[in-house]
Amino acid sequence: MPETNRIEYKRELNIDVDIEKEVIAFLNYHEGGVIYIGIDKTGNVVDVSDADGDALKIKDRIKNNISPSAMGLFDVVVEERKGKEIVKITVASGSEKPYFKKKYGMTD
């Protein structure tokens, strides 16, 4: 299944993946969407080495780094595809648009 405007694939969760940005895009989109961690851009399943740990990190990042609160608008689960573990993030369209990434640090 190829990527679409409602499906996004990420090979892995690493420093280069701004998962908050992806979630915010779906929160602000009128239909929401699904993000898969552990599937590459061509749709091939790759194993997530610590799927449970990644799922917890993702939940924490969404909860703490997005405003207004996205609680109740997303679900993060570990699934098995082709014998490998992946992380599936289902995001509903938010009702308090626009959603944005919180900034941290001192302000002027």
Can you name each region flagged by the protein language model?
Residues M1-D108:
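Conserved N-terminal catalytic/coupling substructures associated with nucleotide/phosphate chemistry
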